[in-house]
């Protein structure tokens, strides 16, 4: 077991065979060393007690019942002050049964077996270090290929190099006759190797420092190489450079952590504690078991068969031994990661066995389910719904959830204000939903941020801080613009609520994790708070033109303009002096969101038009020298000195409302920045015309 105060971090790395043996082996008071599992048995079919030397043996893993040995001679737990009691008859430690949760065993394999994670997981660590194709190594591991001279520094008698297939007729005629003679086992193992033994010998022969230096020199040569002029050639060079970089990094990690590469080939296989792979007895003597037990049994069966073949190697055909080595490799692969890049092993009901990797990975794996997915105090969970009326940094917290999360703070407020004499009275008042409870709760949440988290938390924006607002119902109200960081939508997604308790956590939530401080992507720098889906539809409906078109209801610039002007009766378009007049008329229902109007605009403006040098549709003159130039989207009032007195733009009520909201948002965000008012009318090909240019045009 790991002491959580003494050890503050956990590192997962390769274990050496000696370390695996130290995990499992222990010396009993009678001098016997136990820990090795040699039999594929689990429980006796009648008594349901662990079998001897099996996967549940009490002598190896500890007693099933606390303080009770197999023979029943002792039935008491040893005291902590005394030496651990030990049954001399059956050899079981008289300790608590919880020890079966972390006491391990091991299986001594008859042949080296490669670890499937480091061979078949992409990118393959073994293939990267040995600088060989992965398919070639897989064929070698499964005994489809043989390698000659696996250890380079030793002398050889055969002039063999590289790989060859045992299935070739020439090799099948020569090698059985040559290697079947007695006394040639050492010579045979030195000259020719296959399976995990061949991989292990090549890894032992590696010099990591020379591998790093050689890879670095090759990388420098590739960096000096000029472009080939073709995409395929450039991609090939880049792939080779990436491969060399991975090889250098991998070699560096092995050197820094003092891990030997040959540890990626297993000679001892750890056996998990029985409580992590249980067998449970149901009614009427029926047993259900973990899939790991069946996979362990298959490994032991095949390993024991290989041991028998090797013990009778003089009379056992060489091909049968090689085939059995392949079966042992496949059994260990299925135990560690069943079905990786191949067909998985299945039970009698055609269901794939759950391997060690399946128990660790995934949403229901050991890490996410038991270590990362623990229940946390001061947390809750509910469905999210849209809250468009909320500010960006606020969220709607259901009253029922808020009173549970902040109950301790409310109780402290009640007792501190002498509204409740003790804890029990305060809880009674909370259950009674007294009006003062909600007032105190409102005061508490105004000064206390909360954290919202949506699983899976793939980046730091998966957890953001918000200022809560009490809402009715049972759903969390969330502003739609913050959904991009959470990758959330409102089709039934759930989010977790956490209350930061310490002062440091609250300061971090306010200064770093508040949603309005995380509007840009930390990876790309692009904005995250972008309107989408229903927001775009709403903006489109708000700013859309009327059925006749905002640009065509008064004037038309088509080729048949004169005929159009004669036959068309101009509607009366209202004039407004400012935003306030538009708001009042809209509230009094004199105009609607799509009504066209003339709005007085500032003269120090910047405007976008669709025509580079647009000519006025109509010019009106007064006796005082004032003229009115009417364009497609705006009209100008110009005095006798050719100066612009006033400007009216043709727009809609919806666009006025939208522009005002954008203007208020910009002023609230950038109060100190000076800006020029901008009105967006026209299409994408519009250009900017400033008031200075217009004044110069009319002078």
Curated annotation (Swiss-Prot):
Top EC group: transferase
One short Pfam name that applies is RNA_pol_Rpb1_1
Q: Which SUPFAM superfamilies match?
A: beta and beta-prime subunits of DNA dependent RNA-polymerase (SSF64484)
Swiss-Prot/TrEMBL keywords: DNA-directed RNA polymerase, Magnesium, Metal-binding, Nucleotidyltransferase, Plastid, Transcription, Transferase, Zinc
Binding residue positions for Zn(2+): 69, 71, 87, 90
GO MF annotation terms: DNA binding; DNA-directed RNA polymerase activity; magnesium ion binding; zinc ion binding
* Cellular location(s): Plastid
Q: Which GO cellular component terms, listed alphabetically, does the Swiss-Prot or TrEMBL entry include?
A: DNA-directed RNA polymerase complex; mitochondrion; plastid
Q: Which cofactor does it need?
A: Mg(2+); Zn(2+)
Q: How is the cofactor bound?
A: Binds 1 Mg(2+) ion per subunit.
Give the E.C. number(s).
2.7.7.6
Where Mg(2+) is bound, by residue? 489, 491, 493
Q: Which GO terms describe its biological process?
A: DNA-templated transcription
What protein family is recorded? Belongs to the RNA polymerase beta' chain family. RpoC1 subfamily.
List the HAMAP family. RNApol_bact_RpoC1
Known function: DNA-dependent RNA polymerase catalyzes the transcription of DNA into RNA using the four ribonucleoside triphosphates as substrates.
Q: What is this protein called?
A: DNA-directed RNA polymerase subunit beta'
């Amino acid at each position: 077991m790991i002491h959580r105060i003494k050890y503050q971090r956990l590192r997962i790395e390769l274990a050496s065979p000696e370390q695996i043996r130290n995990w499992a082996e222990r010396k009993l008071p009678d001098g016997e060393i136990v820990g090795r599992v040699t039999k594929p048995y689990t429980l006796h079919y009648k008594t349901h007690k662990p079998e001897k030397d099996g996967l549940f043996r009490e002598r190896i893993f500890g007693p099933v019942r606390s303080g009770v040995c197999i023979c029943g001679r002792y039935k008491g737990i040893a005291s902590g002050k005394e030496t651990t009691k030990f049954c001399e008859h059956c050899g079981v430690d008289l300790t608590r049964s919880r020890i079966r949760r972390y006491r391990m065993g091991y299986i001594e394999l008859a042949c080296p077996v490669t670890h499937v994670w480091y061979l078949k997981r992409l990118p393959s660590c073994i293939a990267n270090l040995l600088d060989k194709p992965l398919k070639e190594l897989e064929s070698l591991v499964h005994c489809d290929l043989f390698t000659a001279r696996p250890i380079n520094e030793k002398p050889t008698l055969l002039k063999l190099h590289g790989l060859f297939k045992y299935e070739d007729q020439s090799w099948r005629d020569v090698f059985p006759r040559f290697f079947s003679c007695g006394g040639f086992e050492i010579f045979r193992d030195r000259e020719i190797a296959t399976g995990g033994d061949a991989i292990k010998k090549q890894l032992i022969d590696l010099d990591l420092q020379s591998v790093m230096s050689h890879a670095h020199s090759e990388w420098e040569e590739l960096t000096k190489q000029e472009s080939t002029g073709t995409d395929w050639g450039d991609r090939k060079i880049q792939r080779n450079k990436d491969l060399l970089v991975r090889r250098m990094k991998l070699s560096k990690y092995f050197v820094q952590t003092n891990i030997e590469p040959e540890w990626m080939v297993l000679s001892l296989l750890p056996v998990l504690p029985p409580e992590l792979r249980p067998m449970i007895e149901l009614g009427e003597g029926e047993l259900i078991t973990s899939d790991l037990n069946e996979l362990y049994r298959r490994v032991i069966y095949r390993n024991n068969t290989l041991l028998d073949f090797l013990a009778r190697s003089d009379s056992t055909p060489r091909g049968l031994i090689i085939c059995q080595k392949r079966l042992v490799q496949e059994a260990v692969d299925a135990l560690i990661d069943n079905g990786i890049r191949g067909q998985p092993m299945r039970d009698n009901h055609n269901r794939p066995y759950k391997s060690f990797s399946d128990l660790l990975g995934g949403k229901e794996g050991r890490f996410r389910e038991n270590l990362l997915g623990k229940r946390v105090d001061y947390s809750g969970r509910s469905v999210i719904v849209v809250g468009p009326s909320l500010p960006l940094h606020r969220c709607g917290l259901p009253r029922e959830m808020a009173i549970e999360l902040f109950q301790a703070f409310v109780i402290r407020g009640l007792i501190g204000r002498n509204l409740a004499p003790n804890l029990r009275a305060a809880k009674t008042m909370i259950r009674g939903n007294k009006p003062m409870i909600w007032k105190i709760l409102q005061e508490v949440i105004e000064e206390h941020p909360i954290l919202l988290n949506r699983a899976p938390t793939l980046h730091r924006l998966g957890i953001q801080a918000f200022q809560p607002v009490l809402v009715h119902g049972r759903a969390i109200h969330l502003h739609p613009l913050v959904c991009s960081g959470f990758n959330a939508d409102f089709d039934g997604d759930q989010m977790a609520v956490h209350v930061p308790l310490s002062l440091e956590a609250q300061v971090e939530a306010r200064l770093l994790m508040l949603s309005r401080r995380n509007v840009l992507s930390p990876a790309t720098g692009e904005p995250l708070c972008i309107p989408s889906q229903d927001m775009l539809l709403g903006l489109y409906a708000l700013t859309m033109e009327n059925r006749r078109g905002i640009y065509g209801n008064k004037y038309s610039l088509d080729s048949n303009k004169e005929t159009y002007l004669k036959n068309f009766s101009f509607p009366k378009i209202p004039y407004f002096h400012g935003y306030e007049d538009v708001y009042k008329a809209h509230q009094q229902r004199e105009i609607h969101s799509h009504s066209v109007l003339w709005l007085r605009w500032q003269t120090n403006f910047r405007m976008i038009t669709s025509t580079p040098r647009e000519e006025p549709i109509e010019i009106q003159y007064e006796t005082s020298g004032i003229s009115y130039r009417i364009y497609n989207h705006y009209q100008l009032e110009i005095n006798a000195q050719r100066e612009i007195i006033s400007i009216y733009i043709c727009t809609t009520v919806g666009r006025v409302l939208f522009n005002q909201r954008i203007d208020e948002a910009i002023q609230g965000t950038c109060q100190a920045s000076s800006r020029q008012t901008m009105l967006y009318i026209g299409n994408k090909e519009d250009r900017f015309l400033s008031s200075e240019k217009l004044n110069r045009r009319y002078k």
